[in-house]
């Protein structure tokens, strides 16, 4: 079997090919393969690993363009996923600066993590003597987010981060913000929510790749949505993002039951929408947009049932 590893020596990028017999690796994990290559073929190969138990998150890499936790990925699973392939390309995590081979720079991510104040500020009712406890129901609200091991797989898969990192944070940072804000022991959830809003909470593009590739099956996309709801309930409801969310709700409940894209632009950007006239003309020519829908489209079948479902969801959230 052929393993093409993307390498970096501090000056140039290059790829190196290693060959291993299938029978020698089929009982190993991906990390086991990397260790075998380092021990038997190339001691200069650099990668990070520690616990080998899917706890520390240090060994995440990409295989054929997708993120995997190396110690938690069996080679038999990769054989099954990439059937009829005898070649695997192993690369460092995407959306990170590469330091050496499969080793990436975590400092920018840690700086973003600091922004959301990643430590619990407990309510005054707790003390060092009595402890800082919560019941099982309260813990269950955040138990999934506690599973995050900061492996960076979500960052590597994030399409928004690939496009522009200047106005966004790593998905796991928002997961940590939600865990802290939703903790029943927290003195002030907003000390975590406000910096999340200020650093791109509304810029998620909803591709859900962070969720799809998380080795711990955490939905960072859902955590982002929950942070948005909390932010709006606390009065942080101005700007393009909240206006977009409100427009969706208005069209679903008060409108026809489907998004009116012409009105959406006007609600969000107002007169600034004029700058998108060229795009609007292109869409109309392609039959993708009907200008008459600005007056409202036809109501979808079953709209009353949709409204009932939304009302029921709201009621359940309040309980």
Curated annotation (Swiss-Prot):
Gene3D superfamilies: 3.10.20.30, Alpha-helical ferredoxin (1.10.1060.10). InterPro entries: 2Fe-2S_ferredoxin-like_sf, 2Fe2S_fd_BS, 4Fe4S_Fe-S-bd, Beta-grasp_dom_sf, Helical_ferredxn, SDH/FR_iron-sulfur_subunit, SDH/FRD_Iron-Sulfur, Succ_DH/fum_Rdtase_Fe-S. It catalyses: 8-methylmenaquinone-6 + succinate = 8-methylmenaquinol-6 + fumarate. Its cofactor is [2Fe-2S] cluster; [4Fe-4S] cluster. Keywords: 2Fe-2S, 4Fe-4S, Cell membrane, Electron transport, Iron, Iron-sulfur, Membrane, Metal-binding, Oxidoreductase, Periplasm, Transport. This is 8-methylmenaquinol:fumarate reductase iron-sulfur subunit. Belongs to the succinate dehydrogenase/fumarate reductase iron-sulfur protein family. Residues 1-96 form the 2Fe-2S ferredoxin-type domain. [4Fe-4S] cluster binds at residues 148, 151, 154, 158, 204, 207, 210, 214. Binds 1 2Fe-2S cluster. Binds 2 [4Fe-4S] cluster. Its EC number is 1.3.5.-. Transmembrane segments: none annotated. Its main location: periplasm. It is a peripheral membrane protein. GO terms for molecular function: 2 iron, 2 sulfur cluster binding; 4 iron, 4 sulfur cluster binding; electron transfer activity; metal ion binding; oxidoreductase activity. It is found in: Periplasm; Cell membrane.
């Amino acid at each position: 079997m052929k393993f093409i590893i993307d390498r970096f020596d501090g000056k140039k990028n290059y790829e190196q090919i290693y060959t291993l017999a299938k029978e020698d690796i089929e009982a190993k994990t991906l990390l086991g393969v990397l260790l075998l290559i380092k021990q038997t073929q190339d001691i200069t190969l650099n990668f990070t690993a520690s616990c080998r138990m899917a706890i520390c998150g240090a060994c995440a890499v990409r295989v054929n363009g997708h993120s995997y936790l190396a110690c938690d990925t069996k080679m038999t699973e990769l054989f099954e996923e990439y059937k009829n392939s005898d070649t695997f390309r192993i690369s460092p995590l995407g959306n990170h600066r590469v330091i050496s081979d499969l080793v990436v720079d975590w400092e920018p991510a840690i700086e973003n993590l600091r922004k959301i104040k990643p430590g619990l500020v407990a309510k005054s009712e707790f003390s060092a003597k009595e402890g800082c406890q919560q019941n099982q129901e309260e813990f269950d609200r955040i138990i999934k987010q506690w599973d995050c091991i900061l492996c960076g797989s979500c960052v590597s898969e994030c399409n928004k981060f690939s496009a522009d990192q200047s106005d966004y944070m790593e998905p796991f940072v928002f997961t940590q913000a939600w865990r802290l804000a939703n903790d029943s022991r927290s003195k002030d959830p907003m000390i975590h929510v406000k910096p999340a809003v200020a650093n791109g909470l509304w810029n998620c593009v909803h591709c859900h790749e962070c969720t799809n590739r998380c080795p711990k099956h955490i939905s960072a996309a859902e955590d982002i949505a929950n942070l948005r709801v909390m932010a709006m309930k606390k009065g942080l409801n101005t700007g393009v993002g909240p206006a977009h969310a409100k427009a969706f709700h208005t069209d679903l409940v008060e409108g026809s039951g489907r998004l009116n894209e012409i009105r959406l632009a006007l609600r969000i950007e107002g007169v600034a929408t004029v700058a998108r006239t060229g795009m609007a003309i292109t869409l109309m020519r392609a039959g993708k947009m009907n200008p008459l829908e600005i007056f409202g489209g036809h109501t979808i079948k079953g709209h009353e049932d949709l409204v009932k479902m939304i009302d029921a969801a709201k009621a359940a959230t309040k309980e």
